[in-house]
């Protein structure tokens, strides 16, 4: 520990000027300054007199001439004796290297060198005397590499460097005007870049001048005799450390400590004449603990920031195993002496086994201060956060010990500390002994483990014993209240791997999380796409872990029992973005195991759904979805049934029981399979399953049936079926294996919509790997898919019982609710192709990533004019075409062509008018008869024939000229085919496709070849590191050459030098982020599906092929090779889907949080160099997308900013996430929908009706419309039925909002054309609801279990002198019903309100509000009934 303290005490540095820190820093650059010799004698006469020993020392400090500011740390050289030889110039040899790195690359940054004489007088006293100084310009010349050296002689001036701070010295270059130059004296020096130094920049501060011989913990000592460890620095090996069971105790108790702290902050911040302002005061908002590894110089990595909470709050939020073991006496003690505890386990991968490394703890408090404190106009709408450091501690671990339980005293006061901030005062030291002083400052306790988490698990076995010993040791200390330190022991299941998060840092689930269903106790690892919430399992009053809200600071990832309680909402971290991060719930497929009873399954399968038959008319083989799938690509490709007929059958839908939900009568689905068109099914009616036995009837399961135009049920088999025929005629050459890979890896995402209101019910996803036939003729699989919806809302946080307190955070909560289960069947029927395929004369595209210039893929064969479709000339057929049909320019010049066009035009017109044609025929007959009689007319006919022949001759001349002009182009095109190579790339969104082209110089002289590409998606890899990375990924064995390409300035066209007959390999990379962003229409598309009687005839969507041409040209313009890359787009994986509803014509700003990178699917294990940086790319260039790293070991945020369009426009785009620095393949792809809606803001009180009107504008035609709400129990519309919207008219739509809970939520309102089932208008109703004033409170206890409820009565007295009529409402209609919803009470009389409470099967506690409203529906009184189910 002393080693760290000694190093830390000597590491004081001065930061750069504050104005300089505001500038955007550039990249870090390392430098080496070598001080070689001091020539001459800079000492004045008489200085050395009466000195016994005189030595010389050089000192160097960085200086900012712009702001006249010294910064960094003063470097001191070793002392050298001064030996004056008469008649000979003095020369002192130093040869000392100095190292530093900086981001302030500016000519005004200089180094000031001072010459100091150290003398020892005869009396033994020592003296230091400044003899001169010089200024070294560091960045006046640009140094590019390590071989660039800036050397020179530094002139010295008399005086001290303090003279640079004199106000008259504006420019250091003007020293000659103010200072005296020391003649015949200089310092020889050199400056060179040191590019290896930034690799160890995390071990010492920026702008600090250090010698290579100085001790920097973390850098290995030099292996040679020079002792220069920074010349070729090497980092010491790191050890992963874990901290668990962290708790902090403050003296005398946490409550009294924070009370005194708050009082002092109040007196400091609030006005002196008043203790508060507008009823507000300074309060504690959050308690943070910074934990990091410090090497005496700097934190090796940015400290991890976690939030610690008082033990009492944690006990209210989580019932842990260890806390249950406490006896009654200990519980009484813990109510007085509390600790700040952290449930998370901290992982520190940057620790080094060195005595200079220490663990540093910084306790920081965040205070909420009203904005109006220091202003004349106080604001009541917001508050300001203010942070202050309270305590800190440091500890050097012993790696040989492995694991230990550690207790450290906390430090405070105005002393130097790692945070470089002022720390809260310490208790007076003159009042207590040394032992008591350590306790009075506070202590931090934790369990330490180095190397492996297994050691930490072993240490936990002794946690309880250790805690008892800790309590016993505290008994020996005399405290003012004589209370014991509480026991804080945690079970292994409570600790979460990784640091804790603030509420604004919600975690997202990985692609394959482990989730537990309410009906099962075992954990199921499900590769899913919609993560269900435990809130969906109808435990109405049970306190669930991370169920109804994920806004808690730390999600308990290990909880699996639904009877544990939720933790309280904590406050948001300071400086978090305004758009608080939301959780990426993940597009997770739900359970495929049926939850229906056997009786319901029997009734469901008794319905005559269409069977899936194979090519022999036999029922397809049934596959169990729970069985694993062994994918064998060779077996699939060897199947003789080349046609795959994919069958999707939507059979039934099961609702989730919810008494307050009004379910639709019809639904429809939207999805997209492979690269077929996006499908929107027609509306499907929900019909309840019939049963003769009422006891076994299932009122929740409904069969899907098709509907006719008039609304009647269509005859035929129930359900809805779609077939996709994927045959060799549909697939392109080489695409078959990509389609099989699509089935093996992809999931089909299905959105379920309300057929009447066009509101989204939820989404489901199903894996398609079971459709792989693996040699079988046909397979089928049945799925019961969870239909899940995700809601984002703000929960009202109550801090310290003050609901109106300023500065309370309102984090966005994420709720997932299971809306039902979709029963569907999928099948794959193998069939022989309809047309017999001809024998291929050419081989399919090769899988090799190396393309040669002459390997059979070239497009020209021996000068033949034929195409390359067939090598058999006898079978080649060429069809002649008119030249005028091939060239529009030629057709415009030909007279005969114009006549044909005229005749065709005349014929077209004559066909439209029969009478006019007859008149023209009679006129032509009359003229012909007259011409025969008249000789002059005969001559005119001869002249006409001659003119026609002249025109034909002219046309032939034009055609000849055209042929001569196009002949060079045609010959050049045919010759280019001889040097053209073709390559096919099957590309997906965001995935880089790598290949190499073997280029050979066919000439006997050297050339500089220019590579021209006609697409920006394809580029040449010019970075050797990127080239090597892709060769390792693709296992390509070809040579790599450094600095192979040259790119001219201001261009992106690479050039390559080729020797005569030389062959090289050119690396290419194709990557695109452009996809079709056209979203589906929000409505059932029945008409388009009726046009396709055979649904298997669906054509491919807009994923069209394209070609990219790469030309290799010499310096004189000759083509030596052409590469034609054929791009075949393939469907991409969609890992998660987000659907946001946002006000129209505004910017949507969202922040989505990712978990730590190593938990993501596909993340590499054991990546060297620490955590990779997350990079994101968006498919829409008009959308701003970026990522932000929160700190070591913490997740990262993805920020998006989208410009919304007019209502009801839907915008769709994709985001690709990478942890690979070269963006080889995305680890996740997100699909995001943004619905633009008209915004309506409503402010109301819980239980009270708030009414307002919306203006409806009619369209061009008359429409029959109806308004639908997403929360019909909270938002009512008037008129509530179908009404007529006149054309171009204006009409009011009245809405009434009655929220059932306090907080902020979003309600969607759609106006739908009931005839066309089209969306006419849509609104986003933003409800901000506050709690009512509770007039009376009641508490009852009800037994758990049973089928009957419980009846109770509450008395209400009419306080008015007149008779009154009241109405009753409740926020929990599923738990409470009234005997009468309306009642009358005479003046001054009392009425007994009859209540009936519903039975419950689970334990818990619920608060039910009873609203008593008057005739105008205004709230008269509100009763609160707290129900305990025991």
UniProtKB/Swiss-Prot annotation:
Q: Which GO terms describe its cellular component?
A: ciliary basal body; ciliary base; ciliary transition zone; cytoplasm; non-motile cilium
Can you say where in the cell this protein is located?
Answer: Cytoplasm, Cytoskeleton, Cilium basal body
- Show the segment(s) annotated as Sufficient for basal bodies localization: 824-1430
Q: Name one GO biological process term.
A: negative regulation of canonical Wnt signaling pathway
Keywords assigned by UniProt, alphabetized: Cell projection, Cytoplasm, Cytoskeleton
Coarse class of the primary localization is cytoplasm
Q: Which domain of life is it from?
A: Eukaryota
Stored InterPro entries: NPHP4
Q: Where do the segments described as Disordered lie?
A: 828-857
Q: Please list the coiled coil stretches.
A: none
Into which family does the record put it? Belongs to the NPHP4 family.
What job does the chain carry out?
Involved in the organization of apical junctions. Required for building functional cilia. Involved in the organization of the subapical actin network in multiciliated epithelial cells. Seems to recruit int to basal bodies of motile cilia which subsequently interacts with actin-modifying proteins such as daam1. May down-regulate the canonical Wnt pathway and promote the Wnt-PCP pathway. Acts as a negative regulator of the hippo pathway.
Protein name listed in UniProt: Nephrocystin-4
User: What gene name does this entry carry?
Assistant: nphp4
């Amino acid at each position: 520990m002393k080693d760290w303290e000694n190093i830390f005490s000597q590491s004081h540095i001065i930061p750069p000027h504050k104005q300089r820190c505001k500038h955007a820093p550039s990249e870090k650059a390392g430098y080496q300054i070598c001080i070689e010799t001091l020539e001459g004698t800079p000492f004045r006469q008489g200085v050395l007199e009466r000195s016994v020993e005189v030595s010389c020392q050089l000192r160097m400090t960085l200086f900012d001439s712009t702001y006249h500011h010294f910064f960094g740390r003063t470097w001191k050289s070793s002392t050298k004796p001064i030996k004056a030889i008469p008649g000979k110039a003095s020369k002192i040899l130093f040869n000392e290297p100095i190292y530093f790195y900086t981001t302030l690359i500016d000519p005004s940054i200089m180094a000031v060198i001072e010459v100091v004489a150290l003398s020892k007088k005869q009396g033994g006293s020592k003296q230091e005397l400044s003899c001169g100084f010089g200024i070294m310009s560091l960045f006046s010349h640009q140094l590019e590499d390590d071989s660039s050296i800036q050397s020179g002689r530094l002139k010295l001036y008399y005086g001290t460097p303090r003279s640079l701070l004199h106000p008259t010295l504006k420019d250091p270059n003007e020293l000659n005007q103010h200072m005296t130059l020391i003649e015949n004296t200089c310092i020889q020096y050199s400056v060179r870049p040191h590019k290896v130094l930034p690799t160890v920049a995390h071990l010492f501060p920026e702008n600090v001048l250090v010698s290579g011989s100085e001790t920097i913990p973390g850098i290995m000592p030099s292996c040679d005799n020079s002792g220069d460890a920074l010349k070729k620095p090497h980092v010491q090996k790191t050890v992963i450390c874990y901290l668990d069971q962290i708790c902090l105790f403050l003296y005398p108790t946490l409550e009294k400590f924070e009370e005194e702290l708050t009082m002092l902050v109040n007196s400091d911040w609030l006005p002196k004449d008043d203790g508060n302002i507008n009823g507000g005061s300074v309060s504690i908002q959050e308690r943070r603990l910074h934990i990091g590894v410090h090497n005496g110089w700097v934190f090796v990595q940015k400290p991890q920031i976690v939030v610690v909470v008082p033990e009492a709050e944690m006990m209210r939020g989580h019932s842990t195993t260890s806390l249950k073991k406490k006896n009654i006496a200990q519980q009484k003690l813990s109510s007085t002496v509390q600790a700040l505890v952290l449930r998370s386990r901290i992982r520190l991968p940057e620790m080094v086994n060195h005595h200079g490394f220490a663990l540093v703890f910084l306790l920081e408090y965040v205070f909420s201060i009203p904005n109006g404190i220091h202003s004349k106009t106080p604001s009541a709408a917001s508050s300001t956060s203010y942070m202050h450091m309270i305590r800190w501690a440091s500890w050097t671990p012993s790696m040989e010990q492995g694991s230990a339980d550690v207790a450290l005293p906390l430090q405070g006061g105005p002393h130097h500390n790692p945070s470089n901030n002022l720390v809260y005062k310490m208790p007076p030291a003159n009042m207590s002994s040394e032992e008591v002083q350590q306790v009075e400052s506070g202590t931090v306790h934790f369990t330490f483990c180095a190397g492996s988490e297994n050691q930490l698990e072993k240490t936990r076995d002794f946690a309880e014993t250790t805690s008892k010993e800790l309590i016993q040791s505290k008994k020996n200390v005399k405290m003012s209240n004589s209370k014991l330190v509480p026991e804080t022991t945690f079970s292994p299941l409570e600790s979460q791997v990784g640091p804790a998060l603030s509420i604004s840092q919600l975690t997202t689930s990985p692609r394959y999380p482990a989730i537990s269903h309410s009906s099962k106790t075992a954990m199921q690892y499900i590769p899913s796409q919609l993560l269900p919430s435990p809130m969906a399992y109808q435990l109405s009053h049970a306190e669930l872990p991370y169920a109804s809200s994920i806004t808690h600071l730390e999600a308990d990832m290990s909880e699996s029992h639904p009877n544990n309680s939720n933790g309280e909402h904590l406050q948001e971290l300071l400086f978090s973005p305004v758009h608080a991060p939301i959780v990426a719930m993940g597009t997770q497929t739900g359970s495929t195991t049926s939850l229906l009873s056997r009786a319901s399954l029997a009734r469901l399968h008794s319905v005559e759904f269409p069977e899936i038959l194979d090519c022999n008319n036999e029922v397809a083989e049934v596959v169990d979805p729970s069985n694993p799938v062994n994918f064998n690509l060779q077996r699939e490709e060897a199947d003789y049934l080349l046609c795959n007929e994919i069958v999707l059958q939507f059979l039934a839908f099961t609702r989730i029981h919810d008494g307050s939900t009004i379910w639709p009568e019809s639904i429809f689905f939207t999805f997209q399979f492979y690269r077929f068109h996006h499908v929107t099914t027609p509306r499907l009616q929900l019909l309840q399953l019939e049963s003769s036995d009422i006891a076994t009837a299932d009122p929740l399961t409904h069969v899907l049936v098709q509907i006719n135009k008039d609304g009647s049920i269509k005859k035929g088999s129930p359900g809805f079926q779609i077939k996709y025929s994927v045959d060799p005629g549909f697939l392109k050459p080489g695409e078959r294996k990509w389609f099989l890979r699509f089935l093996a890896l992809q999931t089909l995402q299905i959105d379920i919509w309300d057929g009447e209101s066009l509101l989204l019910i939820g989404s489901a996803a199903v894996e398609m790997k079971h459709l792989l036939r693996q040699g079988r003729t046909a397979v089928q699989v049945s799925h019961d898919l969870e239909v899940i919806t995700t809601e984002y809302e703000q929960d009202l946080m109550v801090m310290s019982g003050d609901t109106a307190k300023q500065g309370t955070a309102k984090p966005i909560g994420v709720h997932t609710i299971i809306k039902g289960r979709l029963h569907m069947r999928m099948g794959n029927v193998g069939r022989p192709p309809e047309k017999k395929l001809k024998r291929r004369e050419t081989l399919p595209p090769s899988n090799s990533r190396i393309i040669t210039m002459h390997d059979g893929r070239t497009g020209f064969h021996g000068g033949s004019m034929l195409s390359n479709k067939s090598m058999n000339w006898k079978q080649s057929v060429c069809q002649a075409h008119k030249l005028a049909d091939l060239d529009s320019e030629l057709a415009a010049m030909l007279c005969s062509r114009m006549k044909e066009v005229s005749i065709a035009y005349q014929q077209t017109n004559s066909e439209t008018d029969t009478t006019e044609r007859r008149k023209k025929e009679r006129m032509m007959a009359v003229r012909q008869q007259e011409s025969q009689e008249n000789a002059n007319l005969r001559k005119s006919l001869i002249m006409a024939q001659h003119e026609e022949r002249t025109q034909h001759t002219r046309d032939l001349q034009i055609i000849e000229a055209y042929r001569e002009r196009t002949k060079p182009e045609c010959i050049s095109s045919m010759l280019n085919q001889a040097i053209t190579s073709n390559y096919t790339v099957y590309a997906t969104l965001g995935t880089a496709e790598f290949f190499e082209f073997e280029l050979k110089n066919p000439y006997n002289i050297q050339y500089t070849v220019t590579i021209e590409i006609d697409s920006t998606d394809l580029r040449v890899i010019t970075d050797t590191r990127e080239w090597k990375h892709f060769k390792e990924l693709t296992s390509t064995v070809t040579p790599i050459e450094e600095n192979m390409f040259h790119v001219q300035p201001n261009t992106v066209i690479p050039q390559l030098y080729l020797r005569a007959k030389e062959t090289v390999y050119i690396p290419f990379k194709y990557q695109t982020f452009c996809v079709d962003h056209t979203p589906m229409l929000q409505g059932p598309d029945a008409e388009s599906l009726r046009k396709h009687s055979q649904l298997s005839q669906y054509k491919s969507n807009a994923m069209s092929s394209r070609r990219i041409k790469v030309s290799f040209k010499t310096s004189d313009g000759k083509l030596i090779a052409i590469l034609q890359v054929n791009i075949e787009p393939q469907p991409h994986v969609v890992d998660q889907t987000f659907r946001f509803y946002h006000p129209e014509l505004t910017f949507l700003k969202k922040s989505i949080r990712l978990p730590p990178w190593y938990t993501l699917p596909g993340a590499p294990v054991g990546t060297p160099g620490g955590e990779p940086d997350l990079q994101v790319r968006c498919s829409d260039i008009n959308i701003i997308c970026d990522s932000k790293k929160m700190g070591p070991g913490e997740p990262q945020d993805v920020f998006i900013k989208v410009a919304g369009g007019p209502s009801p426009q839907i915008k769709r785009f994709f985001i690709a996430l990478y942890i690979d620095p070269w963006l080889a393949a995305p680890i996740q792809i997100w699909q995001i929908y943004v619905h633009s809606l008209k915004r309506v803001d409503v402010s109301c009180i819980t239980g009270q009706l708030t009414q307002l009107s919306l203006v409806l504008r009619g369209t061009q035609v008359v429409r029959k419309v109806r308004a639908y709400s997403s929360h019909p129990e909270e938002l009512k519309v008037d008129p509530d039925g179908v009404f007529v919207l006149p054309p171009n008219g204006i009409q009011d739509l009245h809405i009434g909002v009655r929220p059932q809970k306090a907080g902020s939520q979003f309600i969607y309102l759609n106006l739908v054309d009931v005839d066309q089932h089209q969306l006419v208008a849509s609104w986003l109703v933003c409800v901000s609801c506050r709690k009512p004033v509770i007039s009376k409170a009641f508490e009852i206890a009800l037994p758990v279990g049973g089928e009957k409820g419980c009846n109770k009565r509450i008395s209400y007295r009419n306080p008015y002198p007149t008779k009154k009529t009241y109405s009753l409402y409740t926020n929990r209609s599923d738990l409470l019903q009234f005997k009468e919803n309306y009642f009358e009470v005479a003046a001054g009389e009392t009425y007994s309100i009859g209540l009936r409470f519903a039975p419950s099967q689970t334990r818990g506690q619920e608060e039910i509000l009873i609203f008593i409203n008057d005739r105008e529906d205004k709230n008269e009184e509100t009763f609160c009934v707290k129900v305990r189910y025991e």
